[in-house]
Amino acid sequence: MLNKFFKKTKYITVSQRALGDIHDDFTKKPSIPNGMWVKCDGCGKVLYKNDMEKNNKVCYHCGYHFRMNALERLELILDKESFYEFDKDITAANPIEFKGYEDKIKNMQNKTNIKEAVITGKGTIGREEAVVCIMDSNFMMGSMGSVVGEKITRAVEKSIELKLPLIIFTTSGGARMQEGIFSLMQMAKVSGAISRLNEEGLLYLSVLTDPTTGGVTASFAMIGDIILAEPGALIGFAGKRVIEQTIKQKLPEGFQKAEFLLQHGFIDNIVSRENLKETLRKILVIHGRGN
């Protein structure tokens, strides 16, 4: 009789293995794919990479401009399907037989999906036609070798032939050491071609992007009729430490940044990436009316 009132309560039993699975669910780290997040060098905040790339590779917190490759910039600036590429199959030789140079070039071509550190061609920007050269710092730091110099020189000559304005987007670590003196020759060659462009009364727009240094700065980057720069771009010839060691003086903070150069009259304006295409279009329109 008493057993009816004092029945033993039955409980659900959980095996030790199941308990272990529950514990693992709470303690194991979440699986996040590599490359999904990037840290902004400007403000230090962590950004969702897809959102940053949709924002033209600009930080949506502080406006820091991440580096763009040549194909990305081509898509940003040129009208869709308007670009016709020049000399796309020219590749580097090894004029001083630098060990491993050919392999390095092949690796860079596979990695970047371009043949050299510059893309040249003609296209339209807001329906305004121009010859365009876009350098790429992902290809051997945008270093200027014989092919880069040759492609830009040919683009300048094509600009003269077609009577079109020239726009060069620069980004470079300077001369390409693997080509020795042949690399340094390109500074004079490109500058000479641009001098002929000036004699024809044609417009040359130089757009300095991060970083523009070395022989490129010392030659064609700084001789544009109009010189624009992206915000925060590093622009200079030698590095800060080299200069300080040479002149034995402490240099001002940020003296090689675009903002410092604008303040001291070395460039004409700083244009954010979102406004760059429209700014270039307006300049081309004004130039066209002037002619």
Swiss-Prot record:
List the pathway annotation.
Lipid metabolism; malonyl-CoA biosynthesis; malonyl-CoA from acetyl-CoA: step 1/1
- What are its cofactors? Zn(2+)
- What EC number(s) does its UniProt record assign? 2.1.3.15
| UniProt-listed PROSITE patterns | COA_CT_NTER
Zn finger spans (C4-type): 40-62
Q: Summarize the subunit comment.
A: Acetyl-CoA carboxylase is a heterohexamer composed of biotin carboxyl carrier protein (AccB), biotin carboxylase (AccC) and two subunits each of ACCase subunit alpha (AccA) and ACCase subunit beta (AccD).
Per its database record, what is this protein's job?
Component of the acetyl coenzyme A carboxylase (ACC) complex. Biotin carboxylase (BC) catalyzes the carboxylation of biotin on its carrier protein (BCCP) and then the CO(2) group is transferred by the transcarboxylase to acetyl-CoA to form malonyl-CoA.
Name-wise, this protein is: Acetyl-coenzyme A carboxylase carboxyl transferase subunit beta
Q: Which gene is annotated as encoding this protein in its UniProt record?
A: accD
